[in-house]
Swiss-Prot record:
Pfam families the UniProt entry points to: V-set
Residues of the signal peptide: 1-17
Protein name: Ig-like V-type domain-containing protein FAM187A
Residue numbers on the Cytoplasmic membrane side: 398-413
Topological domain ranges for the Extracellular compartment: 18-376
Keyword terms, alphabetized: Disulfide bond, Glycoprotein, Immunoglobulin domain, Membrane, Signal, Transmembrane, Transmembrane helix
Coiled-coil features, chain-numbered ranges: none
UniProt family annotation: Belongs to the FAM187 family.
Compartments in which it is found: Membrane
Regions that span the bilayer: 377-397
SUPFAM superfamilies in the record: Immunoglobulin (SSF48726)
Topology class, membrane: Single-pass type I membrane protein
């Protein structure tokens, strides 16, 4: 009996030791390349992405990430402290923030939040001494010129383009989940620009032979110019899925409802948390869905009206005052009184939050340079003063010239 128990304990200890060895040798199974290569990766602007450091020597306790705009550039950014301990929370990152405030290092991987097109370049995983183990060629494609294609209207994506041996095309991601449930919703898939050519640099890793994203550093300048007009796409179609039955009423709220219902009236209880905001008449407003990222399926409703992308997506109509951008934010330009109401936000097919908007035409609001409208007013005022000053100086300069050379007596004082 004791022999059997001892055998079982030794067997269990051996399994545990095996698991520990496996965890410790995770980087031994992926040897670092003898010649540094660049793995191509493409993303849409405002998205967050992760770059794993797939290999490193066992004796290296922490990695340091470096960034170069172009290979061999004399200017290299160090993206961490030299112990690899820089941490950034995604919720604290704002659109347009500097790269050094939009990244994080976790488990040797580099996380970049709300990437911008200027973040495109080469990322190196290495040591504080500048020894590189793994590298990425990252292409962040701008969403400003993004083209929307609506399948329900019979529209088709861009056709492939051919320029001799150069083949330019769109590669689509998977469809998102339906953005609403219980009612007609929408789902979409993002398409990024890729090209195929035998003239690409051999130093860049390719998932498919001779195929990389259009903004890759592997693409020669002359080929990149030809592919410049092939913008990212978003393909949109309708969908309909049932809602999952969940109990959303909390016990405390339920007790209040039962108490009030005994009195004879049942109060209105919102399905989701509601936030109140009061906006000045004629000023702009941008609403973000809590916890949503650009790659999520996000939808917006105003009261009982569904704001579908087929009508409200940015770029559908240039004169739109209310629209949804490609980062899933709802924009209201020049707020009007009829914009008052509750704006509901769906995330991944679930109703998650409400935003009650009130519009006021009066009230005291201190001016601040953080307000874009205040900055615009100051800029226009300064430009006006500069123009008036330029005209004034020009007139007096001409009068002085005429007076000195007696060429224009009528201007003499």
């Amino acid at each position: 009996m004791h022999l059997a128990l001892t055998t079982v304990l030794l067997w269990a200890w051996g399994l545990q030791a095996f698991e520990i060895v496996e965890k410790e040798n995770i980087f031994q199974r992926t040897p670092c390349p003898a010649f540094l290569m660049f793995e191509n990766a493409a993303y849409l602007a405002d998205m967050s992405f992760e770059l794993p450091c797939h290999c490193k020597p066992e004796e290296v306790p922490a990695v340091v990430w470096f960034y170069q705009k172009h290979l061999g550039s004399s200017h290299t950014k160090v993206l961490t402290d030299f112990d690899g301990r820089v941490l950034t929370e995604a919720a604290q990152v704002r659109v347009g923030s500097d790269m050094l405030t939009r990244f994080s290092i976790r488990m040797f991987s580099l996380l970049v939040f709300r990437a911008q097109s200027e973040d495109s370049g080469l990322y190196f995983c290495g040591t504080r001494k500048g020894d590189y183990f793994y590298a990425y060629d990252v292409d962040i494609q701008n969403s400003e010129g993004m083209v929307a294609t609506f399948q329900d209207k019979g529209q088709e994506p861009f056709a492939d383009e051919y320029y001799g041996h150069l083949h330019v095309f769109t590669t689509f991601w998977e469809w998102t989940p339906c953005d609403r449930c219980g009612v007609r919703g929408e789902q979409w898939r993002i398409g990024l620009c890729y090209l195929q050519s035998p003239d690409l640099s051999p130093r860049y890793l390719k998932a498919v032979p001779d195929v990389v994203s259009c903004g890759s550093r592997a693409v020669p300048r002359k080929l990149r110019t030809k592919a410049r007009d092939h913008t990212p796409e978003v393909l949109v179609r309708s969908c309909l899925v049932p809602c999952e039955k969940t109990k959303t009423i909390r016990e405390g709220v339920l007790a209040i409802i039962n108490y009030v219902s005994k009195v004879g009236s049942r109060p209105w209880v919102p399905q989701v948390p509601i936030q109140f905001h009061q906006q000045r008449l004629g000023h702009g407003l941008i609403i973000s869905c809590p916890g949503a990222r650009p790659e999520h399926a996000v939808a917006w409703d105003k009261d009982r009206q569904h704001l579908y992308r087929t009508q409200y997506l940015k770029g559908v109509n240039r004169s739109m005052r209310v629209f949804i951008d490609h980062g899933n934010q709802l924009h209201i330009r020049f707020t009007q009184l009829d914009d008052r109401g509750i704006y509901y936000c769906w995330r991944q097919g679930v109703l998650v939050a409400g935003f009650r908007l009130g519009v006021t035409s009066h009230g005291h609001y201190p001016a601040s340079f953080s307000d874009p409208e205040t900055r615009s007013a100051v800029e226009l005022t300064l430009i006006g003063y500069l123009l008036i000053t330029a005209v004034f100086v020009t007139i007096h300069f001409c009068r002085c010239c005429c007076y000195l050379f007696h060429c224009c007596p009528s201007f003499s004082p």
